[in-house]
Amino acid sequence: MSQNHRILLLNGPNLNLLGKREPGIYGSKTLDEIVADLKHNAIELGVTLEHLQSNAEHELVSRIHQAMGQVDYIIINPAAFTHTSVAIRDALLGVAIPFIEVHLSNVHAREPFRHHSYLSDVAKGVICGLGADGYQFALTAAVHQLRAA
């Protein structure tokens, strides 16, 4: 492979509490464990994976802006911002970097307010309800799409 693709992983609010917060819904793996596994798999796939978790919407928006021209694909678990953030949607549309939306839980089987996403209709794909494995599936899909382009 002649090009080392760069993938940005973004995680939204409260995901820093994974492993402690409602493990029956979100699983027992910590975010650090999930990211370490992803970085290991990224190396095996020959891509670079960068990560940011933030509880602040503006930090996620700023990182998306910084990704323009620097990142080839975004994997994002916007967490609660899924249901509220026009700003993140507009940032993703503004940089025109393809992205996959990931959720650990099946948001469609939860409270009605979690059923709507401001990102799903503009994402390349959405993975939900598969726990931490969803991140791995998203990474694999992103790499396949980049190599097919």
From Swiss-Prot:
One Gene Ontology term from the biological process aspect of the record: amino acid biosynthetic process
UniProt pathway: Metabolic intermediate biosynthesis; chorismate biosynthesis; chorismate from D-erythrose 4-phosphate and phosphoenolpyruvate: step 3/7
Keyword Lyase: yes
Catalytic residue positions: 26 (proton acceptor), 103 (proton donor)
Annotated residues for binding of substrate: 77, 83, 90, 104-105, 114
Catalytic activity, EC: 4.2.1.10
Highest rank taxon of the organism: Bacteria
Annotated site location: Transition state stabilizer: 21
Catalytic activity: 3-dehydroquinate = 3-dehydroshikimate + H2O
InterPro entries named in the record: DHquinase_II, DHquinase_II_CS, DHquinase_II_sf
Alphabetic keyword roster: Amino-acid biosynthesis, Aromatic amino acid biosynthesis, Lyase
Similarity-based family: Belongs to the type-II 3-dehydroquinase family.
Subunit structure: Homododecamer.
Protein name: 3-dehydroquinate dehydratase
Naturally occurring in which organism (per UniProt): Aeromonas salmonicida (strain A449)
